[in-house]
Amino acid sequence: MTNDEGMTKSEDRGARNDESFWDDGAALVREQPETKRVYDLEERTAGFGEAIIDFAKAIPQNPITNRIITQLIGAATSVGANYAEADDAVSKRDFLKSIGTCRKEARETKYFLRMIVRAVPELKPQARTLWIEAKELHPIFSIIWRNK
C-alpha cells in the first residue's frame, strides 16, 4: 500500500522521521520559489550532482568530513548516472534495476547530508536545500519504478 507520493508506509514513516531532523521550528521557504522546476529528469539529476559537488567544496576537510564528502558525492552523482543508464536500458529488467538504484542513492544522499550537518552545523541551510531536492527525487523514482 502506498501514499500519494508512491511510498510505502515504512518509506513514508522514514521520510517523516528525516523531516523532524531538519525542522528547526521555522517555516522553510525555497530560495527561489518563482523559478521554474526542471522536469527533464536527466538535466535535473545532473544539476543535483553539480550542486552537491559545489556544496562539497565548501565543506571543511578533516578526518571526519573527508569520508562523508566522498560518500555524499558518490551517492548524489550516482542518482544522475543511474538515471542516464536507465534511459538507455536495453531491457525492462535493466531499466528497473537502474531506477531502483536511483531511489536508493537519493535516500543515501539525504543520509550523508544529515551527517555533514552533524559534523559542520553551520552548513545546515545549504544542506537543507539539497536535502529537499533529494527528498523530492526519491518519490519520483519510486513512482517510475512501481509503474513500469
List the predicted regions and their residue ranges.
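Amphipathic alpha-helical assembly/interaction segments
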Residues: 1-148
